[in-house]
Regions:
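Long, solvent-exposed, non-transmembrane segments immediately flanking or lying between transmembrane helices
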Residues: 28, 32, 36-268
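Eukaryote-biased feature marking scaffold/signaling PDZ-domain proteins and nuclear chromatin regulators
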Residues: 9, 16, 20, 241, ...
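Eukaryotic intrinsically disordered and solvent-exposed regulatory patches
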Residues: 21, 234-236, 294-297
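Membrane-anchoring signal-anchor transmembrane alpha-helices and their immediate flanking context
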Residues: 1-79, 331, 338-363, 367-376
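An acidic- and aromatic-residue-enriched active-site/binding cleft used to recognize and process polar
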Residues: 17, 255, 315
């Protein structure tokens, strides 16, 4: 018998061993994925639920200012927290522009390209622009000794907000404290908890201040430390205001004791601070305090308030063992083992150097005359 007849079985045997090794390697990779990723990392054996949350806040702090406009004045919570309550947020005023003793009447508009004039023909009666403080009367009157502007019917004198106080009016606001009370509920598991943990005593709660290292679960935060933890400078931010985010993460594994389900706090600045884009930076709004004089004339104090808005963002997911997701993931994992054969075939049919040997054994090619004989 010619020796060439013995070569093919030997080569096929070598191919079969390599195919078996590849097949086992693919199966081990799938097994590692199912056990390591699906069950251990992603906890595929658990049913999950999203958090339902409520938040209330309480700010404390007192400071004093002494200015030529207001004199010596005490500022407490009722003065600088506006409004007193918001949904999942709190605003603390840190800087302001006062326009005192405004009353409705006629006065010159602030000078700009659209309001400066030389005579009455430059002013249009009834004209109102986007940035107007009032309605033009059609008269051109002196704003000061060198400039004339169009007269308006408005709250007079009109506000001049071209110069923001620096440093911030309430510099001491960085020492104000905020108590954040957060109650959470996972309805699917009927599990509820709050961020004032059961281990806290009244004495501890009165004296603790949040610190990531020493007091990571204290729900009382110093405003300056919140800004600092987000990588910002409080005194700079206090001038024009900004929006901060206090994030509370409640990721809980309910297969463990309830004491392990605790909040994790993090901080970041939410409004974009870009040194290259200085148009309309920070956060501000206007409000007024109204008075009526004995003569019956209504007056007001207009305040343009700059400050830090703190948004409290609560998120989280809880998981607990359940038979249904466990069986679904086990079944999916077993089904993946069927992929091992397909992947193995792809490797040996298209990637290996001697792939034609495997193809010869996997597929049987029938000649035309053999096919005719079979059909006949």
């Amino acid at each position: 018998m010619p020796t060439t007849h013995y070569d093919t079985p030997r080569i096929v045997l070598i191919r079969s061993r390599k195919v078996g090794l590849i097949n086992r390697a693919v199966q081990l990779a799938i097994l590692a994925y199912v056990i390591g990723w699906v069950f251990l990392w992603e906890k595929g054996y658990q049913e999950t639920d999203s958090v339902v949350s409520s938040v209330t806040t309480k700010v404390k702090g007192v400071t004093v200012t002494n200015t030529s406009t207001l004199g010596t004045r005490i500022w407490d919570v009722a003065d600088y927290v506006i409004p007193p309550q918001e949904k999942n947020a709190v605003f603390i005023m840190t800087n302001m522009i006062f326009t005192l003793n405004q009353s409705q009447g006629h006065c010159p508009e602030l000078p700009d390209d659209n309001t400066e004039c030389n005579n009455n023909s430059s002013c249009v009666p009834g004209y109102v622009s986007t940035h107007s403080n009032g309605i033009q009367t059609g008269a051109c009157i002196p704003y000061n000794s060198s400039i004339k502007t169009c007269e308006v019917f408005a709250w007079c004198p009109v506000e001049d907000d071209n110069h923001i106080p620096k440093p911030a009016f309430l510099q001491a606001a960085e020492n104000f404290t905020i108590l954040v009370k957060n109650n959470i509920w996972y309805p699917k598991f009927n599990f509820s908890k709050r961020n004032i943990l059961p281990t806290f005593s009244s004495t501890y709660l009165k004296n603790c201040i949040y610190d990531a290292q020493t007091d990571p679960f204290c729900p009382i935060f110093r405003l300056g430390k919140i800004v600092e933890a987000a990588g910002q400078n409080f005194q700079e931010m206090a001038v024009e205001g900004g929006v901060m985010g206090l994030q509370i993460n409640w990721d809980c594994n309910l297969d463990r004791a309830a004491s392990h389900c605790v909040p994790r706090y993090s901080f970041r600045r939410l409004d974009n601070k870009d040194s290259a884009n200085t148009v309309s930076p920070g956060y501000n709004f206007r409000f007024a305090k109204y008075y009526k004089e004995s003569s019956g004339i209504e007056t007001r104090t207009l305040i343009k308030a700059y400050g830090i808005r703190l948004d409290i963002i609560v998120f989280g997911k809880a998981g607990k063992f359940d038979v249904i997701p466990t069986m679904i993931n086990i079944g999916s994992g077993l089904a993946l083992f069927g992929v091992a054969t397909v992947l193995c075939d792809i490797v040996v049919l298209y990637c290996m150097k001697k792939r034609y040997y495997y193809r010869e054994k996997k597929y049987k090619y029938v000649e035309d005359y053999e096919l005719v004989g079979l059909l006949g």
